[in-house]
Amino acid sequence: MVLDKILRAGEGRILRKLKAIAEQVNLIEDDFTGLSDGELRGMTDEFRQRVAEGKESLDDLLPEAFAAVREAARRTLGQRHFDVQIMGGAALHLGNIAEMKTGEGKTLVSTLPAYLNALAGKGVHIVTVNDYLAQRDAENMGRVHRFLGLTVGVIHPQMPPPVRRAQYACDITYGTNNEFGFDYLRDNMAWSADELVQRGHNFAVVDEVDSILIDEARTPLIISGPADNPTRWYTEFARIAPLLERDVDYEVEEGKRTVAITESGVEKVEDQLGIENLYESVNTPLVGYLNNSLKAKELYKRDKDYIVTDGEVLIVDEFTGRVLHGRRYSEGMHQAIEAKEKVEIKQENQTLATITLQNYFRLYDKLSGMTGTAMTEAAEFHQIYALGVVPIPTNKPMIRNDQPDVVYKTEIAKFDAVVEDIAERHEKGQPVLVGTTSVEKSEYLSKQLTKRGVPHEVLNAKHHEREATIIAEAGRKGAVTVATNMAGRGTDIMLGGNPEFIAQAELRQRGLSPIETPEDYEAAWQEALEKARQSVKTEHEDVVEAGGLYVLGTERHESRRIDNQLRGRAGRQGDHGESRFYLSLGDDLMRLFNAAAVEGIMDRLNIPEDVPIESKIVTRAIRSAQTQVEGQNFEIRKNVLKYDEVMNKQRTVIYEERRKVLDGADLHEQVRHFVDDTVEGYVRGATADGYPEEWDLDTLWTALGQLYPVGVEAPDTDDRDGLTTDHLLEDVQADAQEAYDRRELDLGEGADGEPIMRELERRVVLAVLDRKWREHLYEMDYLQEGIGLRAMGQRDPLVEYQREGFDMFQTMMEGIKEESVRLLFNVEVQIAGQETEAAPAENVAVAPAPPAGAAALPAAVAPLALPDAAEDDRAAARRTPPEVPAAPAPPAAPPVFVKGLEPRRPTGGLRYTAPSVDGGAGPVTILDSGAESPVAGGAARAARGPAGGSAAGASARPARNAPCPCGSGRKYKRCHGDPARRNAEAE
């Protein structure tokens, strides 16, 4: 590929630059070695001051900062950064992806750019693939940063907002891509500034960047709330699906993960349901249930794509083999699988906020990443993220022996050969790591090894609890570890055992922690580490003599990167190692991409099933199949980004407006423009056609009366001579502005002397904006679902989506203005300690008001209903690590409660949808387990408007345009609803 060649053309130049930086660091290393601990720590303050004064940039400080980190790591971890690690750190600081092979110390490399960029005081995010690695790296690498005087935070899924905010206030924050992304979305659902947790997007170092930005990029992050209850149709179609015959009643394309019903199938479904036409408009929703039930039957396999535990369907990550606890497929797919497995069917969801990982990480001012396998995707990194890929040389030459693939005719013959190979290696003491592609196959191989009498460990989605321990011991003499793809990343496999892991385990047993007891931990670390090194030294030599770690792959993955990750477990840091893949013509990759030609050759040559072949034809077929799948997946990711770019522009506008409101911007002038624009829309719409005497001004005045208390009379038909739209508009706009001024005077001022109207404007605009945005997300989802059909009309679906999406966005913005104006004029307001004011009001539902002094939230955005949640938050805040500074909270809002906009406790929690599985099936959802989340669901209820609640003080008063209950025949607003009349009667 031409682009690949162009991208690699500058490798030599950048490597020479990085090598020169490493040499600069080496030249000043002795200067830092001679410093005391206090003097070394004091360098951080000096660096910060030099940056703050603007005398030097971070680039200027790089050699000194890197030298300081190298020395701190030597004193705390007993590890000195190699020159190639210095080069990797510099590549990251310059905004590149550093490709560093397994075992080259990528985690240690991250300390260099993290420290340097933290000196600017804007925060640094270290992004990992799972919570275990985030916690581990925050503890271990955090020792270096804390030694140098920086604060280190870590984000956990169940962390309450006050603690979460404090973690983000640290100089360096560790967490997963999902947590960072969800916090961004939650911040843009917050109702007040003191709920915000993030403080911007300055610099991010993404560990395993290919996994996060490539593998997981097809599926967006989604926060959703409960929608409609599950229907009987899931169960009904789960009953019908087994009655339909594959290739007769429906067709399946496994490569594209699609199903298509045939005419025969349609007839059978119609007979089973007792309907005449499945495709009548009234039956349209049934087609979705049918497709999902067929996908659940054919494309989602138990113990491969998911497992069933305790009556719950749990998704298994395709790339790592881990169980994705709490996550669910969306678009009804998970419910279809639940119906198939005859377990409880849970609720569907409605989107509240969403963003793709591509667009989230493009928010950062500077982005970088690390991985062992990036060059195969260099073009994609460049096109989508504007990131260069820099291959960093290994510290020691790679001496791993990569054996050619062997191919068997059947899967049974392949596994028989695998068992024999493992048994031979185990007998001579060579450790073996076996990679499988599914839980089902790992358990099958485990049974075969047990029959053969080979002791082994199994690491898959059902046995993930001991993952770190199993992998850390996978390099010991004679160890056999059968693992799904989850073994590809995380803990290092060292020959003879991992001394650091052993030392950490010993200190944990002694009750020592680098966070809770840092001084005692540091004092005991070196002794524990040296003891562990001595214990594994002899065993290391025995394993090297046996040939090092042997990596055996039982199947090729559709991505070359996943295969390379498995191979990369062997041969780290110049160790001996060997790798080989055993394949069969029944493997998924071969089966999906035409292995019939190879099978025909083997049949013609009468090759026995237990005799392998090594053929260039097979090698080319595998490479071609993998390239084809990678190309398809790249196109899917590009397509996702193109469509999300439309939403991204709209999301940026909405979120910027929200942030202005939360930051306390004065909305008064903006709301006045809302009033003028809304009135103009009403007037011009009513006067667009015909002569003035033909205008239906009665209807116009009725509409205006529902918007605000109109103070001018509509011109009679006889008085319209010379009347123009502009003249009429000028009169009505002036009247509306006067009414708005009166409304502000009626509300008065708060305890702080500010007009109550300012706080009301903020709350109403925020509530309306959120509700309209949620409705817009639903409509955009609906638009995108069917937009592909435009291609049948010779129209570009993307162009149509962009055009109609823009029109819908404009309509939404006009709707925000109109509804905000209507509510500002008509909603009831209660001031803490006062009676409800008697301004004209719509008959809105009133929820119980929160206690005085509490921040009022919109109906659709309220705290989760948790027992003693406030006390939990306070307790969690008290548990904040001592070195983490408490983030200042903005001042509380005035105690103003807007009736109809008060908080309501949702009946169900939020759901967080994140990537990690095959995007062809739709996203998966993380169920909120009741975490102290800063926001909550209930969007489906909000979209339907205020519901229920106590109507005291509101329902007793008729709507303004309803007939007056006195029987006069006049509208309420012109009779007993007239403020002037009420005041006169009161006198």
From Swiss-Prot:
Cofactor: bound how, per the entry note? May bind 1 zinc ion per subunit.
Q: Which stretches of sequence are listed as region Disordered? A: 870-916, 935-987
Catalysed reaction(s)? ATP + H2O + cellular proteinSide 1 = ADP + phosphate + cellular proteinSide 2
Q: Where is the composition biased (Pro residues)?
A: 882-894
Q: Which UniProt keywords apply?
A: ATP-binding, Cell membrane, Cytoplasm, Membrane, Metal-binding, Nucleotide-binding, Protein transport, Translocase, Translocation, Transport, Zinc
- One Gene Ontology molecular-function label: ATP binding
Biased composition annotated in UniProt, kind: Low complexity: 936-945
- What membrane topology is annotated for this entry? Peripheral membrane protein
In this chain, ATP is annotated as bound at Q85, G103, E104, G105, K106, T107, D492
Establish whether keyword Signal is in the entry: no
CDD domains in the record, alphabetically? DEXDc_SecA, SF2_C_secA
What Enzyme Commission number(s) apply to this enzyme?
7.4.2.8
A GO CC annotation recorded here is: plasma membrane
Biological process (GO), any one:
protein transport by the Sec complex
Q: Where in the cell is it found?
A: Cell membrane; Cytoplasm
**Keyword Translocase listed:** yes
Binding positions for Zn(2+) per the UniProt entry: C964, C966, C975, H976
Per its UniProt record, what InterPro entries does this chain match? Helicase_ATP-bd, Helicase_C-like, P-loop_NTPase, SEC_C_motif, SecA, SecA_CS, SecA_DEAD, SecA_motor_DEAD
Q: What does this protein do?
A: Part of the Sec protein translocase complex. Interacts with the SecYEG preprotein conducting channel. Has a central role in coupling the hydrolysis of ATP to the transfer of proteins into and across the cell membrane, serving as an ATP-driven molecular motor driving the stepwise translocation of polypeptide chains across the membrane.
Report the HAMAP family cross-referenced here.
SecA (MF_01382)
Protein name per the record: Protein translocase subunit SecA
Gene of this entry? secA
